[in-house]
Regions:
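Acidic/histidine-rich catalytic neighborhood of metal-dependent amide-processing enzymes
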Residues: 134-208
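Acidic/His- and Gly-rich active-site-bordering loop/insert found
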Residues: 2-131, 148-157
Length: 208
């Protein structure tokens, strides 16, 4: 009996393309954007935790992560999510950072008929508060991981995830949390998919 053929890079790229073309990415991002995770608005405190508990946690659990929500070291600051998926302690480990909070929606500054918390696609561009900062980025990272797991059954590396909900107000408590969780956050490389694109049509990568 011949051995099953291992998926190729082309197979992975094709599977990732299908996630986009099937509308899965757009549907999931629409659900994330719909939550008004405005960290600048004290009235949205419960929504910030809801994003972690109801949106991020189930997605990560589905991929075999151990997931925990932690109180913020700073009083009244929103919680943080820490997750890990260890296939083998001997394998390299990546740490993915993301934030689920957004700036004020500024509803009255959007074009008539549009809302910052309801996505819309115009001329191939998807609009909605958080699509580019930062819900879209960490969602893409997670869907890429899920695509590989579904395709190969494993990743071939370990993954840790840190998601905060207060980046837009200066990340209160993040430094203290990271110091306290130093061992839990230990990794070989950090992937922080946040920041500007120098040119819209060309991916930007900062190394260091």
């Amino acid at each position: 009996m011949s051995k099953p053929v291992a998926p190729t890079r082309a197979d992975a790229m094709s599977a990732g393309k299908q996630v986009i073309e099937s509308g899965q990415l757009e549907r999931r991002l629409t659900d994330l954007v719909a939550l008004r995770t405005e960290s600048q608005d004290p009235a949205q405190t419960a929504v910030l935790e809801q994003y972690l508990r109801e949106m991020m946690r189930p997605m990560l659990l589905e991929m075999g992560f151990d997931v925990a929500l932690h109180d913020n070291p700073v009083l009244k600051a929103p919680p943080l999510l820490l997750a890990s998926r260890v296939e083998n302690p001997e394998l390299p480990t990546i740490l993915i950072y993301g934030h689920g909070d957004v700036i004020h929606g500024q509803d009255n500054q959007w074009n008539p008929g549009l809302s910052p918390f309801a996505t819309v696609t115009l001329d191939g561009m998807m609009y909605g508060r958080g699509t580019a900062d930062n819900k879209g980025q960490h969602l893409i990272n997670f869907l890429a991981l899920k695509t590989l797991i579904d395709l190969r059954g494993s990743l071939g590396f370990n993954v840790k995830v840190l998601i905060e909900m207060a980046e837009e107000i200066g990340s209160p408590g993040l430094a203290e949390f990271c110091a306290a969780q130093r061992e839990a956050l230990a990794a070989d490389v950090l992937i922080a998919s946040d920041g500007p694109r120098l040119m819209p049509e060309i991916p930007t990568m900062f190394m260091g």
